[in-house]
């Protein structure tokens, strides 16, 4: 829970739990993960942990316009290439390969720090119909405006990290958290709660496959 010094925050029934993704059976297709948070909020640490824990056997590409940044220096995986820009044709190729091989390959596309992908058709397909062809995705962004509403509504796992922009926090609450917060709270109180809840590299994990929400922190 958020800091105990504000008893009002205790009205929000979101428990602290160890981080764990209850991944769907690979036979049913791929999965999708969305991480939303500001720089240095813990997204890169979480991304590396998820890759190490859940995607060791996947083949794919890490797309980032900041691919030379320190955050990616330790993300070296034999089956995951690094690309300094977003290349939608590669995602389409993954789909085509699995279409011709009966979903033989566990493909993964990681899209991090690519602010211009919002209207891309391959990203839309990746988070919707391509999952049925064994394609998984991880999208990392600094605000929800970088992802269109259809993509957002089809994400399996949503991870909400600290945001330093009140407008971004308000939009995040409206999209993902409105049903979890007391109706009597105004947005100043909701924003205050969000900042406190996601401080010190904590984040909220929404599991849309199992209908759960919890607060987590990855300690490495």
Feature map (PLM): residue ranges:
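N-terminal pre-Walker A segment at the start of P-loop NTPase domains
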Residues: 1-22
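Conserved P-loop NTPase motor cores
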Residues: 21, 30-53, 65-69, 78-183
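Conserved hydrophobic segment flanking the Walker A/P-loop of ABC-type ATPase nucleotide-binding domains
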Residues: 26-27
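Conserved catalytic segments around the Walker B and adjacent sensor/switch elements
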Residues: 56-64
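Short, surface-exposed beta-edge/turn micro-motifs
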Residues: 58-59, 106, 157, 200-203
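Phosphate-binding and hydrolysis-coupling loops of NTP-dependent motor/remodeling domains
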Residues: 172-174, 178-220
């Amino acid at each position: 829970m958020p800091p105990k010094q504000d008893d009002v925050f205790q009205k929000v029934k979101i428990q602290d739990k160890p981080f764990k993704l209850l991944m769907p059976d690979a036979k049913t297709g791929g999965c999708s993960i969305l991480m939303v948070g500001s720089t240095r909020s813990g997204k890169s640490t979480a991304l590396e942990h998820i890759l190490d824990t859940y995607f060791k056997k996947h083949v794919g590409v890490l797309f980032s316009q900041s691919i030379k940044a320190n955050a990616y220096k330790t993300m070296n995986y034999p089956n995951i290439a690094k690309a300094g820009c977003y290349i939608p044709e590669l995602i389409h190729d993954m789909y085509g390969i699995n279409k011709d091989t009966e979903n033989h390959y566990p493909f993964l596309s990681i899209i991090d720090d690519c602010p211009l992908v919002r209207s891309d058709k391959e990203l839309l397909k990746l988070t919707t119909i391509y999952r049925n062809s064994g394609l998984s995705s991880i999208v990392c962004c600094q605000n929800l405006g970088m992802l269109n509403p259809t993509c957002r509504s089809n994400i399996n796992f949503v991870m909400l990290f600290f945001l330093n922009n009140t407008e971004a926090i308000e939009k995040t609450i409206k999209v993902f958290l409105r049903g979890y917060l007391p109706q009597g709270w105004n947005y100043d109180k909701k924003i205050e709660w969000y900042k406190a809840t996601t401080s010190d590299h904590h984040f909220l994990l929404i599991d849309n496959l199992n209908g759960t929400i919890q607060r987590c922190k990855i300690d490495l």
